[in-house]
Amino acid sequence: MTLKFEGYGYLITGSTSGIGQGIAKELLENGANVVINYAHNEDNANETRELFKQYENQTLFIKADVSNENDVKDMFDKISKRFGRLDGLVNNAVYDKIFSIEDLSVEEYRKELDVNVVGRWLCSKYAIPLLKESKRPRIINIASRLGTKPIDDSVAYCTSEAATMMLTQCCALELTPKYGIKVNTVSPSMTLTPFARKSYTEEEIKETANRNPSKRLGEVKDTVNAVLFLLSDKADYINGENLNVNGGILLK
């Protein structure tokens, strides 16, 4: 099965590291034009520029906070001027901090909801004028298995990921009949990104992997493959769904 992306245009939010960077890399290697978005980390952005140096003509780097409406509007203006088209939006930007319910502040709760829910809605909203002109328009929201199965000390994150799944369904219900835009969620479990490798010990990683029926943790490529399939013409009849990429961890 061949997935064709040459000449298509995509925005991947939060794409200077981890899963977002992996999605961008795969699309670039397949001939797509890709907008790389980041909010603050200039070091990651510069490393990604160097990594994608050979794709300079296919990339556009935009620093924008997805929870800030003016930033989002400006980002889509830049995309329109540079590429003049957009065929897919991958809402990958995320904010996640660990707090118990008692220790969680209003400011932190709002920050997680602003980035993880409001940000995904804002980007979807302002992507519509470009997406509706595409012959294969797609929106993919990257959520988490924690949107359906909560854990301790993550009330804000779990709530935001559950809300994202409903956002996906609402957008699919409204945007598909109007503009043909297909909207889906991809929900990975713990994934071995560079950040995860720094955040957990080898023993913690091994222990978590052993709890999974597949006896391993997710790799970036697992989520990348799911996203590229949903962006492709092979997934035209999949809409409003949540694709779990977790090795079967929700079965336990």
List each model region and its residues.
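Substrate-binding pocket helix/loop in short-chain dehydrogenase/reductase
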Residues: 100-101, 105-113, 204, 208
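Alpha-helical segment proximal to the catalytic Tyr-Lys
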Residues: 129, 173-177, 236
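Residue(s) in the substrate-gating loop at a strand-loop-helix junction
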Residues: 144
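Short C-terminal tail/terminal secondary-structure segment
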Residues: 149, 206, 228, 239-252
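Short, small/polar-rich loop/turn modules that mediate ligand/substrate recognition or access, typified
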Residues: 177-182, 238-240
